[in-house]
Design a protein with these regions (language model features):
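N-terminal Rossmann-like NAD(P)+-binding domain of SDR-like oxidoreductases, especially those catalyzing
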Residues: 1-171, 214
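Residue-level signature of the cytosolic catalytic core of signaling kinases
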Residues: 50, 54, 177-181, 238, ...
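Hydrophobic aliphatic residues
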Residues: 74, 104, 180, 192-193, ...
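A conserved pocket-lining segment of Rossmann-fold NAD(P)-dependent short-chain dehydrogenase/reductase
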Residues: 82, 132-136, 161-177, 187-211, ...
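Hydrophobic alpha-helix immediately C-terminal to the catalytic Tyr-X-X-X-Lys motif of short-chain
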Residues: 147, 151, 155, 188, ...
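C-terminal substrate-binding subdomain of Rossmann-fold SDR/epimerase-dehydratase oxidoreductases
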Residues: 190-305
Length: 305
């Protein structure tokens, strides 16, 4: 099968591309490299540099490949950047997603959309949060990703496509950048590998649902094989505090360095954990990598850089 992966030079997208290549599929990666890296692009993938907000450039990259499946992961993924420049956030995450929807429609290809989980539901959501809880985004990023969901599901209904929305938990693992709006796992790991004090925002009690990137990539393959439309949380359903993440990474590093405390960023949530019951029951997906194991593996990767 021919699979288009937008954002495939990025952290999660490159692992999704790997997963489909390992299955024997042909993969085209479209990425503008604004945050992704050519080093992340798998050797056997075809690469086209294009901006998803430029419909003409996107079509020129995609049409000769004629994908049978589209995995859309290209995004403006920084909460802070979305607050600083909500117009750009909207262009990438809303207009860009619309352009990808149209490219998929022209080829009759179902689209699997990488949505946000935690930034969508808000601090007052029940935990673990089910998919049918009313989204209450707390940032322009959360709002734009929710708008992207609406286009993906509307195109599924309009054009009878088996489009899938995957609301991802906090993904961590090898290849995650520690620069810009990075996850704490990447930031902590890089600082510990250099023997530096990692920055701990807030008091460390804020919680997230940490999912290893290999499990996230497997969810895309599972959704593709199911060949049915749907909306699913992709998560562990387990809340882990930032302080616990730091503790596990310090154990992996054999380090005792104390963190540098810093205030929470604007728009940052106190807690987020998603309910994965639906995807487990309907598609048979469940995470395989426990947090402690995944953090050890992730730190080992950063230690080699």
């Amino acid at each position: 099968m021919r699979v288009l992966v937008t954002g495939g030079a990025g952290f999660i997208g490159s692992h999704v591309a790997d997963a489909f290549l390992e299955r024997g599929d042909e993969v085209l990666i479209v990425d503008d490299l604004s945050t992704g890296s050519e080093q992340n692009i798998p050797d056997h993938a075809v690469f086209a540099r294009a901006d998803i907000t430029d419909a003409v450039a996107l079509d020129q990259a995609v049409d000769p490949f004629a994908p049978a499946l589209v995995c859309h992961l290209a995004a403006q993924a920084s909460v802070t950047a979305s607050v600083d420049d909500p117009q750009r956030d909207c262009r990438v995450n809303v207009l860009g997603t619309l352009n990808v929807c149209e490219a998929a429609r022209r080829h009759g290809a179902p689209l699997i959309y990488a949505a946000t989980g935690g930034a969508l539901y808000g601090d007052d959501a029940p935990r673990p949060t089910p998919e049918d809880f009313l989204p209450r985004p707390q940032s322009p990023y959360g709002a734009s990703k929710f708008a992207g969901e609406a286009y993906v599901t509307a195109w599924a209904r309009l054009y009878s496509l088996a489009n899938v929305v995957l609301r991802l938990a906090n993904i961590y693992g090898p290849r995650q950048s520690s620069h810009g709006e990075a996850g704490v796992v990447a930031i902590f790991s890089e600082h510990l590998a250099r023997g530096e004090a990692p920055p701990l925002r807030g008091d460390g009690t804020q919680t997230r649902d940490y999912l290893h990137v290999s499990d996230a990539a497997a969810a895309f393959v599972t959704a593709a094989e199911a060949k049915r439309a749907g909306l699913f949380n992709v998560a562990t359903g387990i809340a882990t505090s930032t302080a616990r993440v730091l503790e596990l990474l310090r154990e992996a590093a054999g380090a005792s360095v104390e963190p540098q405390h810093a205030p929470l960023k604007p728009g940052e949530m106190e807690a987020s954990v998603l309910d994965p019951s639906r995807i487990r029951a309907e598609l048979g997906w469940s995470p395989r990598v426990a947090v402690a194991e995944g953090l050890r593996e992730t730190y080992a990767w950063y230690a080699t850089l």
